[in-house]
From Swiss-Prot:
Pfam family, one: TPR_1
TPR repeats: 116-149, 155-188, 189-222
Compositionally biased region (Basic and acidic residues): 36-49, 75-85, 99-125
Chain positions with Phosphoserine modification: 90
Any single Gene Ontology cellular-component annotation: cytosol
Name of the gene encoding the protein in the UniProt record: TTC1
Regions annotated as coiled coil: none
InterPro entries: TPR-like_helical_dom_sf, TPR_domain_protein, TPR_rpt
Keyword Cytoplasm: no
Protein's recorded name: Tetratricopeptide repeat protein 1
Compositionally biased spans, kind Acidic residues: 86-98
Chain residue ranges for the region called Disordered: 20-125
Keywords, sorted A to Z: Phosphoprotein, Repeat, TPR repeat
Source species: Bos taurus (Bovine)
Highest taxon of the lineage: Eukaryota
Length: 292
């Protein structure tokens, strides 16, 4: 064999192997200039859920939305046929997002915040028109755009996407969004109230009661929370009694199945509850019919 020549790797190969800038990787859409200013706070005071008014400020209400990527957007062609919760920046851990964005220039953060505000306003208008699918898509894209350092902005976006999902009966997804909103802003009463309502609708009464209590601790004037705190304890007690009866009924059926080969039934065993301790005792009765 001849002598080996010095091999040079083509520069084109290096070009093809360049690592994408983390800042570019997280941008799912091309930059869009922010030509619109944010709506005034007074224009957003109307919440379609008729939630009690709270401290609005940066946390002003968004309007309910629903999830879809059917609406075509520049650069979104790869997302259209995927579930919106699959690998979206809006679903990533906030601390992880913040780590990715730590070297992002302030000007870029400002631009992205303005763009997310534009998408938010777009979602608001879509929601008010009843276009919940399109509105949720706008909120999701706003979350993908909004830098994680603006936690209150992202909290509002999560809360309003939850409202949109409520409109489409996507209750579990809406609960998840509310929880993210509360994590980012623990004093965000609107998000807590929305999650409490969702817990009620999914028969998670204990969790709902805890949220309503949390609301009253932060703002005793919220009538809906006060009314729920008076109503839910009785509902929880009735539910627990119903579950206990169902459990005892199933145990009785199982007991009869096991005892039948021995000529016995659960009627041979009397269960008595101690009123002072609430505990139960079981007594064997040879001829239960004679004791009636």
């Amino acid at each position: 064999m001849g002598e080996k020549s010095n091999c040079r790797v083509p520069e084109d190969l290096f070009t093809g192997l360049k690592v994408t800038d983390p800042q570019e990787a997280e941008c799912l859409h091309p930059p869009v200039s922010s030509g619109k200013e944010q709506h005034s706070q007074s224009e957003l005071l109307k919440d379609v859920d008729a939630q009690p008014q709270e401290d609005q400020g940066e946390e002003e209400c968004f309007h309910d939305a629903s999830a879809s990527f059917e609406t075509e957007e520049p650069g979104a062609d790869k997302l259209e046929n995927k579930p919106e919760d699959d690998m979206n920046p809006s679903e990533l851990d906030e601390e992880y997002l913040m780590e990715l964005e730590k070297n992002m220039p302030d000007e870029e953060k400002k631009r992205r915040r303005e763009e997310s505000s534009r998408l938010k306003e777009e979602g608001n208008e879509q929601f008010k028109k009843g276009d919940y699918i399109e509105a949720e898509s706008s909120y999701t894209r706003a979350l993908q755009t909004c830098p994680s350092c603006f936690q209150k902005d992202r909290s509002v976006l999560f809360s309003n996407r939850a409202a949109a999902r409520m409109k489409q009966e996507k209750k579990e997804m809406a609960i998840s969004d509310c929880s993210k909103a509360i994590q980012l802003n623990p004093s965000y009463i609107r998000a807590i109230l929305r999650r409490a309502e969702l817990y009620e609708k999914t028969d998670k009464l204990d969790e709902a009661l805890e949220d309503y209590k949390s609301i009253l601790e932060k703002d005793p004037s919220v009538h809906q929370a006060r009314e729920a705190c008076m109503r839910l304890p009785k509902q929880i007690e009735e539910r627990n009694e119903r579950l206990k009866e169902e459990m005892l009924g199933k145990l009785k059926d199982l007991g009869n199945l096991v005892l039948r080969p021995f000529g016995l039934s659960t009627e041979n065993f009397q269960i008595k509850q101690d009123s002072s301790t609430g505990s139960y005792s079981i007594n064997f009765v040879q001829n239960p019919n004679n004791n009636r």
